[in-house]
């Protein structure tokens, strides 16, 4: 962990700061503007959120500069058996504090805690080149595919204990709130923040 940073559980008093941080971290990265901060905001009271794993990073001045957000999710087999797993994301680091190991520290410490809490595995989508260092591999290696049955390198799984994912196979279902975003509510929510220009940039996904 980088010297000068401290890590602790997120508290309700941090919500406004972590949502603003998420907006700063994701603005114009994957699309013009972003919706990750709204997703975090809209899920605060959702039973799928795992508050025990949601951590923040503070700089030497006590300003929150990093945040990781966990939710329960599930893998459903063809015979209908449901296997509970977990996921993290968004994981946010303020642009001024990136490349200092904050994201890595948040991932490592929370995954260790998740293992102690006896969760079987973590399922995410992301950049394989980045996440392989934490033990993630192609989810298809565990017989896990996307909700639509597809398989792709960005869909990854990490076992949180030896053989814990052995019985898990089927289609992965993330929280529907991550996809079902009301654009009008997003615009109303985003209006409370300082204006930032939405730009279409090379490399964006949408």
PLM feature segments, named:
Residues 1-13, 20:
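Conserved N-terminal entry element of GNAT/NAT acetyltransferase domains
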Residues 19, 26-60, 64-69, 74:
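Active-site rim helix/loop that mediates acceptor-substrate recognition in acyltransferases
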Residues 52-53, 57, 89-92, 119, ...:
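Internal, conserved structured core segments that host functional sites
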Residues 63, 81, 94-105, 117, ...:
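Conserved glycine-rich acetyl-CoA-binding loop
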Residues 73-88, 98:
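A conserved beta-turn-beta hairpin within the catalytic core of GNAT-like acetyltransferases
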Residues 88, 93, 99-112, 123-124:
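Conserved acetyl-CoA-binding loop-helix of GNAT-fold acetyltransferases
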Residues 116-119, 126-150:
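Conserved active-site alpha-helix within GNAT-family acetyltransferase domains
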Residues 162-206:
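Acidic/histidine-enriched, glycine/proline-rich intrinsically disordered or flexible terminal extensions
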């Amino acid at each position: 962990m980088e010297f000068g940073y401290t890590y602790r559980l997120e508290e309700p008093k941090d919500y406004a700061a972590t949502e603003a941080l998420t907006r700063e971290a994701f603005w114009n990265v994957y699309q013009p503007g972003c919706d990750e901060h709204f997703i975090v905001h809209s899920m605060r009271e959702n039973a799928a959120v795992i508050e025990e794993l949601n951590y923040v990073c503070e700089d030497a001045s006590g300003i929150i500069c990093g945040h990781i957000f966990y939710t329960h999710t599930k893998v459903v087999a063809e015979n209908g058996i449901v296997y509970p797993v977990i996921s993290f994301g968004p994981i946010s680091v303020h642009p001024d504090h990136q490349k200092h190991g904050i994201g890595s520290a948040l991932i490592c410490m929370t995954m260790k805690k998740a293992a102690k809490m006896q969760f079987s595995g973590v399922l995410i989508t992301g950049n394989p080149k980045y996440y392989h260092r934490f033990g993630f591999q192609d989810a298809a290696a565990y017989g896990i595919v996307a909700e639509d049955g597809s398989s792709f390198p960005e869909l990854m799984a990490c076992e949180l204990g030896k053989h814990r994912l052995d019985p898990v196979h089927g289609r992965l279902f993330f929280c529907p709130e991550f996809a079902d975003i009301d654009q009008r509510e997003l615009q109303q929510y985003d209006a409370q923040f300082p204006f930032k220009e939405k730009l279409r940039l090379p490399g964006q996904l949408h």
